[in-house]
Amino acid sequence: RSSDLILVEALSVLTKLTVVGVCDTHRTYTQKIAGILGADPSQLTMDYVGLYHLGWIQDVKMGGRSRMAQLLELLESREEEGLDYDLIELFHMIPTRVTGMYFHRADVVRKQQHCTRFRAEGLYEAEQQILRMYEDPHLDMIPELTRQRDASWYSDSIIPLIQGFEGHAPLTTVACVLNQGSIKDLSDESSVEIPVSVNRKGVKAHKVGLLPRFLKGVFWSIKESDRLTIEAHRQRSFDLALQAMAVNPFVDSITRARKYLEKAASLENINLH
């Protein structure tokens, strides 16, 4: 699985397709926040902005009125798993889990370096077992192991989206689409993850306006990395691919980036010049 964000941008740049990507992160946080507020998730509207899983909930509305102040007040007196309270207190917004990892990335790397087993290794083994289970023609239910591996049920996001396109039920959700002026700080051709309205006529991105100032730099770096990645693919260019990694805020060493790129190109038989 690749990230839908760069695929939306690449397919839009390289083809004439109209592309929409779906990520399940916003639905997870909608349910969590609804539980904190004691509200029905369907009543909430999220002012969400993100790139990949690096997302922020800037506001939460119910019936057109902001409930953000109430949410922040409730969070002061309770401990919710999966929320980064340091970032909430500092920026007065709700970050996603991966956003928390970015702002604590040195700690995350240190923890991974000393762990006995990577999470990916456990997931890989579980996937192999699940695939063997699905070879059984008599299997008529989802294996419990699938639930244990913390699966995301994309059907809960994708089916309503398809129904919205077919005109069965207009939908407001969060999706990966081309920016087209929604975020003023980014180019129209950038793919972004923002609120959209979906109906039989298609998908319409909501206006986001300007990014919070503290987000501008990292978002610009990520989108430049995406642009360089797509251009590297188009030109089959090693230098552009390395540039894409060098400006990516998650990459801390061009030396390691070069070694990784050389190894990946060799293993995957990618012809870069």
Model-derived features: positions:
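Short acidic, glycine/serine/threonine-rich loops at helix termini
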Residues: 8-13, 31-34, 58-60
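Acidic, His- and aromatic-enriched active-site or binding-groove loops in soluble protein domains
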Residues: 16-33, 37
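Long, compositionally biased stretches enriched for glycine and/or charged residues
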Residues: 34-273
